[in-house]
Structures are given as structure tokens and as C-alpha cells.
Amino acid sequence: IGDYIQTKAVIDLVGSKNIKILDRENLDKYNDNVIKTIINGWFMESPENWPPSEKIKPLFISFHLNPSIEAELLKDESLQYFKSHEPIGCRDIYTRDILLEKGINAFYSSCVTTTIDRNNYLKSKTQAKGIIVIGAFDRLKPTLDYKSSFKLLLSLLKYPFKKIDYSLKLLKFNRHLKNQDFKIKRYNQLTKKPIKSHNEGLKLATEMLQKIAENEVMITSRIHAALPALAMGLKVVFIDQGLDHGNHKHRLSGLTNYFTCVNLKDFFMINLDNIPEMDKHKVHKKKIKDTINK
């Protein structure tokens, strides 16, 4: 749902009239009328489809270049494309720095989800209460590695032990939350089935944002749960355990300065009644709004 939360943040800024949602993975195939397009978010699973069509007039804001396809998106043709549409607003420090190294005028814009307005999603005027937990353990859940027969066998051998470790940590986490003087609500940003349409995705994103707006504390390991919560004024605890891979570290660079960021061991030491409020994101929030609405 995270991609659609980012999309919803942009729609909230530009308005819902006369908008068109384009497929991020097929921007090169767009062949309709010339269209102004805000290009933000994670790029991309299909780098062979980059750069976009000439009929797309891009505004880059909150753009993330994923390290797994970095070589493809930094080829000469792509660099010329970035150069012709400078400056490039980057969601993270990593993306900004890699583009600057290539001579592209780039700046750190932060993420569009930091602009989300709580008032747009509160169903009632009652005071927000309770803790919302979204995917706090998503990164710790053991999985099987299907990349090769050897890796699959190795992951199968390790799986039972990782599963036991995961279950024990989850049990301790749940017991800790039960002892808190808060009502606890739990949700998941990962859908059980693929999202079939943009309308469905936006509906799910809206419902998730409404759930976030009702609470006062967020506990998560999902960046697009943490940032909207921050924007809405919630106190945020971000569990970074399991996010050691370079892909995760790069996409989080700069963003984790916005909230209380801990590993699981340190989480149990936190007083959830006394989490500091953070406002480091606000300077970038204003710049995003000004850039999109200019």
C-alpha cells in the first residue's frame, strides 16, 4: 500500500481533478497527449523501460534510485534525461549524492508523504488516542530464498531456527505492548492479494491513512507508515532491525533522522509515554509543497 500512500499524498497536493495515474514501470510507452508528470518514489523494477516518453514533462520530487538498478539508470542516455530536467528532488541522501557525483543538479527533498494533512483523514473530532502498530516485525519474519537451489537448501535448513527466534521475539514484543497503558491497534501494509487497479490502491491507502490519523503513537518498520504518521503529528518509533541490507539503508538515508529509530533490544527500553516529538521534516515539507504548486 506504500506506493499508493505516496500517490495519495501527491493527489492531496495537486487536487483530484484532471489527474491521470501513469504506470511507473512503463513510462516509456506513454503515447497520449503531452502531460505534466510528478515523478516520485522508488525506481524501478524494469530499468529497460527508462527514460520516459518525450510526451511526459517530468517534475522530479522525492525520487529514489534503487541501487539494484543503479547501473542501468546511470547510463549516458539516462544521465542526459536527468540533465535536461534538473533539478532532481531526491527522497534520500543516497540518491542525491549519486546524482551529484554524475554532475546532475540534485537536492534532498525528503518524501512527499511528509506533507499529508491529518485533518483530511480524521473521521471525527475526538482526540487521537492509542498506539497503532504497522508491520513492526515485517523485516524479521523468516523467508525462503529461491534465487538458487543452493540458497533454497540453505534457507530451508536455517528456517526452523529463525522461525523459533522470530516467534520468541514477537511474543516478547506483544507482552511488552500489553503492559502499556494504551489501546493497541495492529494493521499490515502488505496486501494478501495483488492490487488490481489504481482505484483499489487509492482506496486502501485512504483507509490506512484514516486508521493512522486516529492514533497518537506509531510503531513500525515501514517507512510509508512512519512518514505519514510523522506528518499527522503522531510520535513515531521506527524499528530498524532487519534493515541492514544496502538497499534498505540507502532508501532510508536522511529519513530516519525524523523519528525515534531503534533496534528491537532498545525498543524495550523506551518509555512510550515520553517519546519526543520531532519536527526536522517540516522545512522539507514546505519546500515540497512550494515545488509542486509553483
What are these regions (language model features)?
Residues 1-294:
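Active-site anion-handling motifs in enzyme catalytic cores
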